[in-house]
Regions:
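A short helix-coil junction within the Rossmann-fold of NAD(P)-dependent oxidoreductases
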Residues: 15-24
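Active-site loop immediately N-terminal to the catalytic Tyr-X3-Lys motif
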Residues: 38-44
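Active-site helix of classical SDR
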Residues: 13, 49
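Residue(s) in the substrate-gating loop at a strand-loop-helix junction
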Residues: 33
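A hydrophobic alpha-helix adjacent to the NAD(P)-binding/active-site core of NAD(P)-dependent oxidoreductases
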Residues: 1-2
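SDR active-site lid
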Residues: 66-136
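Active-site-adjacent segment of SDR/Rossmann-fold oxidoreductases
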Residues: 19-20, 38, 59-70
Length: 176
C-alpha cells in the first residue's frame, strides 16, 4: 500500500518535474482520500498512506509553484464499488473481530452506501480540478466526504474523534 499510495506518486512526480520545470508549466493531480484528512477505525495503514500523500502534496505545491507547476489532490469519500471489502484491514487479532464486524456493518450498510459516490461523479471532480485554472490544492469529492470534513472542521479534532468513536463503538470505547 505504501508503494502504490505514496511512493508511486512521489516517483511519478520526480520523473515529470524536470520536464514541467523546463516548460514552466504542468499539473499533477493526486488521488488521495477523505481518509487523508480524517480517519475511521481499522484502516490505519490505508489512512497513513493517504495522510502522507496529503502532506507531501501540500509541501510540493509550495516548492513547485515558483516554476508554474501545480499539484492538486482529490479526496473522494465512499465509493459505490467493492473498495471497502477489498481494502479494509481485517488482518487483526481475534480480540477485534466483534468491533471490526460492527464497523464493516456500518460502512457497508445499504443506507450508508447510498450516500457514496459513483466513479463517474469523482471523474467530474478530477476534470474540474484539471481544467478550472485555480490555485487550489484540495478538491473534496462526494457529498459524504464533504459532510464528514465539514463536521471535523466544525467540531474540532477531539470532539470529532469522540463523535467517530461513539458512532462506531457506542459506549464500548471512549476516545482517549
Amino acid at each position: 500500500m505504501v508503494n502504490t499510495n505514496v511512493l508511486g506518486a512521489i516517483r511519478t512526480t520526480k520523473a515529470f518535474t524536470p520536464y514541467f520545470r523546463q516548460k514552466r508549466a504542468g499539473l499533477f493531480i493526486n488521488t488521495t482520500s477523505i481518509g487523508g484528512l480524517l480517519t475511521v477505525p481499522f484502516n490505519s495503514i490505508y489512512h497513513a498512506t493517504k495522510w502522507a500523500l496529503e502532506g507531501w502534496s501540500e509541501s510540493m505545491a509550495f516548492e513547485l509553484n515558483q516554476f508554474g507547476i501545480g499539484i492538486k489532490t482529490i479526496e473522494p469519500g465512499g465509493m459505490k464499488t467493492d473498495f471497502f471489502t477489498r481494502s479494509f484491514d481485517t488482518g487483526r487479532h481475534p480480540a477485534y473481530d466483534a468491533l471490526v464486524n460492527k464497523v464493516m456493518g456500518i460502512i457497508t450498510d445499504p443506507k450508508q452506501m447510498a450516500t457514496y459516490s459513483s466513479p463517474e461523479q469523482i471523474a467530474e471532480v478530477v476534470y474540474e480540478a484539471a481544467t478550472d485554472g485555480k490555485d487550489q490544492l484540495r478538491y473534496i469529492a462526494g457529498a459524504d466526504a464533504r459532510a464528514m470534513y465539514a463536521m471535523r472542521l466544525q467540531l474540532g479534532d477531539e470532539a470529532f474523534r469522540k463523535a467517530i468513536a461513539q458512532q462506531f463503538f457506542g459506549d464500548a470505547q471512549k476516545a482517549a
